């Protein structure tokens, strides 16, 4: 899951899980795996909500893993009511079965170890037993992955990994001997299989290529949007299934070989530019993230436009009321936007950082509430106000309208871990939200970016947009499952491209 665990962000009344595994080979040579389903009770639903509120829908950028002292395969995915997609692998000989998240936001494979005796999270899941495998090779090197809300630690081992009918030999992976219970205890998967670029160990995907197991140097995801169907989705190694997309893919080059990262252009709410990414932003497609995360300044505008109710932040309103008209005057006087807040002594830097890089955890419940922390928040709110007001000035809005709009946005600020609810009866009046990728607009309808939890009168509607500001990579969007459901996604390792086409 990359650098911070991507959560089951919503809970559910019924959950569909993999069924007795059935392997089949179709006429196109692709291998498919049968699915099963299982009911989950109300307790599981509440646990899923708790995981969200603990902030697990957010990445902690900068993967902090540490090390110390000839065909194609199709993996069927299970759709956890639109909150996560996972499938089954085997480790060892004979294969020991594990359910894993196939995660394009990280590169390491880990599963619980039988030597994990003090963690409830380990005991609640399948655990790898090295003594039961004839192909196990000892390594013993310490390994750890630190997430935003917890961590796993353990040691590296080596064994065969079975995916579909492919057997990847001598694969390094972490046997987790300790897992953060608050993060992993109630998860419906055992471990994570990373599909990003190599960091501290050779990824499974690299070994597939090195061992000549796939025809093409690319893999692709199709995520089924119909949660009531048994088939949750499909991951194809070594190619793509033409039955799961329409038209041609739009490809963009990978800009940073750590995540599957690429450049995007403007983000639009309806037909209106938000302006922030018009000069260019970075994004990456992340199969291990449930929602769609982006810069607070823009996500706040989106959630305001769809009527999502978040946290009223009085400090934000204080900045707008005290400094808003001065900000407008400076913007109209053509003062460089990234210097305005330092001119007003709200920020200590002078244009050295972009807006997104200084928005760290504005409303993080764990923030230090010292005077220094408060000063940083005032700086952050000022920078966000500059972004909002600059865009409204471009729309020729009056000063009063700009101030009122900024105050409204303050009311819709939220933490990355907070559920933002909308009125389920207003979906038809909500705008589409579009991302410009490769010069083409990829739109999301309300039905695609709003997630529904529950049934009947108990149904709740949740915004699929969550705020998250990267501190190292600048303004960044994580295009998670909310985006990958409507768009079939190709990860082309051979040409270092990411491609999107309408899913079928």
UniProtKB/Swiss-Prot annotation:
Residues 85-501 form the Peptidase A1 domain. The record marks 68-69, 309-310, 414-415 as: Cleavage. It is found in: Microsome membrane; Protein storage vacuole; Secreted, Cell wall; Secreted, Extracellular space, Extracellular matrix. One of its GO terms (biological process) is lipid metabolic process. Residues 311-416 form the Saposin B-type domain. Glycans are attached at residues 139, 432. Its EC number is 3.4.23.-. The keyword Endoplasmic reticulum applies. GO terms for molecular function: aspartic-type endopeptidase activity. Aspartic proteinase with a high preference for bonds between hydrophobic residues. Cleaves alpha-lactalbumin but not beta-lactoglobulin. This is Procardosin-A. The lineage of its organism: Eukaryota, Viridiplantae, Streptophyta, Embryophyta, Tracheophyta. The gene is cardA.
């Amino acid at each position: 899951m990359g650098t911070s665990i991507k959560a089951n962000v919503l809970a559910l009344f019924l959950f569909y899980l993999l069924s007795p595994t059935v392997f089949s080979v179709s006429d196109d040579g692709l291998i498919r795996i049968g699915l099963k389903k299982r009911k989950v009770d109300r307790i599981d639903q509440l646990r899923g909500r708790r995981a969200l509120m603990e902030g697990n829908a957010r990445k902690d950028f900068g993967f902090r893993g540490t090390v110390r002292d000839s065909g194609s395969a199709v993996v069927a995915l299970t759709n956890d009511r639109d909150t996560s997609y996972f499938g089954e692998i085997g480790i060892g000989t004979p294969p020991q079965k594990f359910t894993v998240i196939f995660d394009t936001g990280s590169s390491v494979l880990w599963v619980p170890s039988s030597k994990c005796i003090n963690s409830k999270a380990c005991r609640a899941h399948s655990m790898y037993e090295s003594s039961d495998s004839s192909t196990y090779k000892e390594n013993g090197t310490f390994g750890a992955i630190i997430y935003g809300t917890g961590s796993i630690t353990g040691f590296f081992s080596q064994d065969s990994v079975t995916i579909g009918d492919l057997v990847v030999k001598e694969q390094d992976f972490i046997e987790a001997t300790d897992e953060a219970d608050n993060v992993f205890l109630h998860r419906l998967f055992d471990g994570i299989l990373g599909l990003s670029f190599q960091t501290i160990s050779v990824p499974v995907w690299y070994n597939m290529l090195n061992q000549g197991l796939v025809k093409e140097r690319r893999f692709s995801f199709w995520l089924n949007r119909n949660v009531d169907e048994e088939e949750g989705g499909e991951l194809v190694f070594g190619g793509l299934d033409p039955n799961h997309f329409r038209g041609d893919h739009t490809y963009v080059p990978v800009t940073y070989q750590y995540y599957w990262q690429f450049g995007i252009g403007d983000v639009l709410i309806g037909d209106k530019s938000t302006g922030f990414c018009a000069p260019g932003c970075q994004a990456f497609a992340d199969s291990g993230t449930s929602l769609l995360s982006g810069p607070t300044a823009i996500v706040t505008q989106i959630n305001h436009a769809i009527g999502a109710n978040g946290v009223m932040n009085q400090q934000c309103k204080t900045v707008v009321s005290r400094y808003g008209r001065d900000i407008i005057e400076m913007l109209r006087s053509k003062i460089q936007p990234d210097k305005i807040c330092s001119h007003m002594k709200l920020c200590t830097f002078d244009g050295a950082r972009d807006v997104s890089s200084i928005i760290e955890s504005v409303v993080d419940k764990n923030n230090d509430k010292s005077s220094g922390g408060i000063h940083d928040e005032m700086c952050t709110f000022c920078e966000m106000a500059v972004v909002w007001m600059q865009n409204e000035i471009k729309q020729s809005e009056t000063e009063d309208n700009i101030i009122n709009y900024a105050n409204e946005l303050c009311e819709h600020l939220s933490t990355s871990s907070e559920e933002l609810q909308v009125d389920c009866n207003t979906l038809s009046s909500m705008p589409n939200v579009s991302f410009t990728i490769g010069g083409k607009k990829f739109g999301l309808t309300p039905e695609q970016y709003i997630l529904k939890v529950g049934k009947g009168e108990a149904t709740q509607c949740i915004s699929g947009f969550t705020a998250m500001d990267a501190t190292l990579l600048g303004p960044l969007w994580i295009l998670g499952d909310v985006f990958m459901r409507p768009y079939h996604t190709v990860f082309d390792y051979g040409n270092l491209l990411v491609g999107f086409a309408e899913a079928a």
